[in-house]
Structure formats: structure tokens, C-alpha cells
Amino acid sequence: TSDTLRQLREEHPDDELWLLMGTDMFLTLQHWHEPEKILSLAGIAAFGRTEADTEELFSVQRDYLYRTYPQAQIFTMTIPGVMDISSTELREQLAQKGGSKWLAPAVYGYILREHLYQTHVDLRHLPLSQLRPVALSYLKYKRIPHVLGTEQEAIRLAERYGADVQKARVAALLHDCTKKLNMEEQLALCKRYGIELDELEKEALKLLHAKTGAAIARDVFGVDEEIYQAIWWHTTGHAGMTALEKVMYLADYIEPSRDFPGVEELRHVCYEDLDKGLLMGLEMTIQEMTAMGNPVHRATIEARDALKG
């Protein structure tokens, strides 16, 4: 543990590290290898493994650690309704294709994605029940409701307009898989996958995640060309969009957590007429970008003009 924390400190010198542990580990911390080093590198956040593990139990050990290791940072908590499972039991369940009920979806997804704890899933042939948590593991926490909302909106739109519901769900789950990356990381992916960029895209971070996300979706998850294109065009749109591309563009635009002037009217129009909804969404985007003094991508202009005839 001390070696791991030392490495993490070198990799993340500006971050504050905390080591989470249950009651049994907390009560024996002084017997670990290099406890003083551990406590100098990270704070300790200990939680009760059962409801019987009260503050009274924690306080004696906490006071001892403070006396013995003055530099220690310790936070203890009790969790109502806690379920008792050991890390050993959880690892065993994961190796047997179980364990998901004990973990936050994004955490479970990260374990599957990185093949940790003897999990051996084929990322290119995941059922939706596993693709969803893996997709969520790519996101910042605050973006998770948006992606889940986009999936649900994509289902409704696909059912309404006869697009492939399964493909709409996959595209929705993966459409923002590279959204959290910075410009340097986005450009590195573009270089890796041979993605050619125009002058606007080279400067507009918001536009890049659609293309790099499509590349990751195809390379890592093995999506087909229809899903690839739906992710590729979900930010700008383009002339002659397929039904799936339209569904993806609009699901991203009007999903339930979106809240901006005109969104309710746009939602109404989208379910009255798909093309009218798409045209309205494109025009709203163009108006917003123009009002902000930002350039509008030519693909968006071409998509609008094609719909207007």
C-alpha cells in the first residue's frame, strides 16, 4: 500500500489522496507495512462494515493513531443500512461474472473495461447490461445523467420514427465517451485514428469529441458503420442524415435533463415531425452560435439548408 501511494503521489503531486477502508482494516492499520509512510501520503477515510461498528469503536483507534502519527488525517463514518461484504468476497463474485449489485455502475464498468479482478469480457460484444456501466466509466460524474437521459430519449425517438432501437441505445451510451478529454488528448486521438480536421475543428474542443468518440466506439466496442456515423455527426449534423443520425442528434439535444429557452417547444415538434424537429434544432444552434460570436461549422449550415430545400 505504501508503495502504491508513493507512486500515486508522484503521478498526482497536486491531488489530495484518501485511502478508504472498512472497520477491520482501520483497527489494524498500525500493523501494516510502513504505516507512518501511508499516513504521511494519504488521509484515512474509514467506514463501518456493519451497523454495530459505531463511533465509539472508531474513536479509540482514531485517538491512538493521532497520538502515534501526529501527521495523520483521519475521517470516520457510519453508514445506515450498510451491507456487509468483504473485498475478497467481491473479487470472487466478479471473477464469476457477478458482483455488480455491490458497486456503482461506473465503478463496475471500469473494472470490466480494464479486465480487473479476473473479469474477462469481450468489449466488442457486450450486452447492454454491461455496455451501459462500461460506457458510464468513461464519463465525469456530472455527465452520467445526460448520457442516461440521451439513451432513454433515443429509445423513444427510434420507436416513434422506426429507427433501430438497439443501435440508437448503443450510439447514445457511447456518444460522449471522449467528452472529458482536453484538447491535447483529443488531438492525440485524432492523430492515432487518422482523423482529418478542418480549421474550425482544430480550434473547437466541443466538436472533436464526436469524431474521437466514434473512433473509440468502433475500435474498442466494435460498433457498425451506422452507429459510428450516428456518433460522428451528433454534434454538427450534416446534409442527408439517416434516421438513426437524426435520432442521435435530437436525443442528445432534448433529453430530459436539458433545460434551455425553447426546449419544450423543440421536444413537442420533434415528436410531431422528425425533420421539422431537426430543422428547428439546427436553426436554434446556428442562432445561438451566431449570437455568441462563434463560427458555425459548415456541416451544420449544409444540414439546415438541405432540410429547408
Please report, for each region that a protein language model flagged, where it lies by residue.
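Nucleotidyltransferase catalytic core that binds NTPs
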Residues: 1-127
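Solvent-exposed, amphipathic alpha-helical segments
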Residues: 89-93, 250, 288
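N-terminal polybasic phosphate/anion-binding patch
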Residues: 129, 139
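Divalent metal-dependent catalytic cores for phosphoryl transfer on phosphate-bearing substrates
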Residues: 133-137, 146, 155-282
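Metal-dependent nucleotide-binding catalytic modules
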Residues: 264-309
